[in-house]
A protein has these predicted regions:
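The conserved SAM/SAH-binding core of class I Rossmann-like methyltransferase domains
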Residues: 28, 75, 100
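Short, conserved SAM-binding/catalytic segment
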Residues: 38-47
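ADP-ribose/adenylate-binding Rossmann-like module
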Residues: 78, 87-108
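Rossmann-fold NAD(P)-binding glycine/threonine-rich loop
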Residues: 83, 101-123
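N-terminal Rossmann NAD(P)H-binding glycine-rich loop of SDR-like oxidoreductase domains
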Residues: 1-17
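Conserved anion/nucleotide-ligand pocket segment
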Residues: 126-132, 136-158
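Conserved Rossmann-fold cofactor-binding substructure of NAD(P)-dependent oxidoreductases
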Residues: 40, 52-82
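Conserved glycine-rich Rossmann-like NAD(P)H-binding loop of the short-chain dehydrogenase/reductase
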Residues: 19-34
Length: 158
């Protein structure tokens, strides 16, 4: 949510960079008090941003937010615990979803469960948009490069 380390940085970024009047955004999380504290800390444009409260374990509350959202950016982790309900709602409501996970097993499960429906509907589910994914991405890249250069093994897909 917006009250965690990455969430606070994201709120600050949007407050400082979102074009006024062109991008409508809100701060979301489980705890109203913590979200209000983030707004106060960030100040500026953030003071006028709506707060939407939902626990990701409450599918009805998640649905209420996602159903009125075009793009959901989630920074609450671990996403294997807190993100599945959000992605499920995003696919059902055709809301694009971006997350910061580095949890490859969870993402594999998401692909298996949601890719076909999301792709058919034009919904973008974009995981691995944070630093957590760098070690996995770099490790995968180095393994593929080694297989290709040292062992002459082609790699069509990872």
């Amino acid at each position: 949510g917006a009250s965690g380390f990455t969430g606070r940085q994201t709120v600050r970024y949007f407050a400082e960079n979102a074009p006024p009047g062109k991008v409508r955004w809100a701060i979301t999380g489980r705890n109203q008090g913590k979200l209000e504290a983030v707004k106060r800390q960030v100040g500026g444009v953030a003071k006028d941003v709506d707060i939407l409260v939902a626990d990701s374990r409450d599918q009805t509350a998640v649905d209420a937010i996602v159903s009125r959202t075009r793009v959901m950016l989630t920074t609450a982790g671990p996403l294997a615990l807190y993100g599945s309900a959000i992605v499920d709602a995003c696919v059902r409501f055709k809301t694009h979803c971006v997350d910061i996970t580095g949890e490859t097993t969870w993402v594999r499960d998401l692909i298996d469960r949601y890719h076909n429906r999301a792709a058919a509907d034009g919904t973008r589910i974009i995981p691995f948009c944070g630093f957590d994914s760098v070690p996995s991405d770099l490790g995968t890249y180095l393994i593929v490069r080694h297989l290709q250069r040292e062992l002459s093994v082609p790699c069509k897909e990872v």
